[in-house]
Design a protein with these regions (language model features):
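Short acidic, low-complexity intrinsically disordered linear motifs used
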Residues: 187-195
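Active-site microenvironment for binding and transforming phosphate-containing groups
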Residues: 1-187
Length: 195
């Protein structure tokens, strides 16, 4: 069994994923952050929230998020507490894009142990599109998910109706300062930034 399939089977043993995700479609305040999620059998579920950095505590350093089409996923510690985050990215300079908010957040706060990756890959996006056309299901049902366990990162195309992983890949995350450089200045930030 692949890693994400095992996590989905554990977290959603008796629960419909679609109903759980749709229950998060609630209006949030106008700040750039939200803290919405849940812990399901030891796995933190961090949903996508439009135009937000949605963070949620991840006490076991194991988290799962869905509906990636260009957003980033991160895990970090703040004041000794581990969080997972789904960071909304619409393209630099576009309304609702949270990269500058994230970059400022990690550079001005006491943030450590940052792991950052982009769950969507071109190959997964093509597979997602093919499966949506083949099955007639929407991209909210045949979706790209991200999964972080410890320092390992994974992406997958999954069918949330069937709780089934269609394809999974292990990703190489950006970890710590040595892999994160701001292109314009060449300076190393205090932690991982989104370029």
């Amino acid at each position: 069994m692949c890693v994400i399939q095992s996590a989905i089977s554990t977290a959603f043993v008796d629960i419909n994923i679609k109903e759980k995700l749709m229950s998060y479609s609630i209006p949030c305040d106008k700040s750039s952050f939200s803290e919405i999620g849940c812990n399901m059998n030891g796995i933190s579920i961090v949903p996508y929230i439009e135009s937000k950095i949605n963070k949620y505590q991840s006490p076991n350093s194991e988290s799962l998020s869905f509906q990636f089409s260009g957003c980033a996923m991160a895990q970090y510690k703040e004041n000794g507490v581990t969080y997972a985050a789904h960071i909304c990215l619409y393209g630099m300079g576009n309304e609702g894009d949270c990269r500058e908010v994230w970059n400022e957040f990690i550079q001005k706060r006491e943030i450590t142990d940052v792991i950052l990756f982009y769950p969507k890959t071109e190959a997964l996006q093509i597979l997602q599109s093919e499966k949506c056309m083949e099955t007639g299901k929407s991209p909210q049902i045949i979706t790209i998910c991200g999964y972080i366990k410890g320092e390992k990162c994974y992406s997958a195309v999954i069918d949330i109706d069937e709780k089934k992983v269609i394809k999974e890949i292990e990703q190489i995350p950006l970890i710590g300062v040595e892999n994160c450089i701001i292109r314009e200045t060449g300076k190393k930030p205090s932690s991982c930034v989104i370029l």
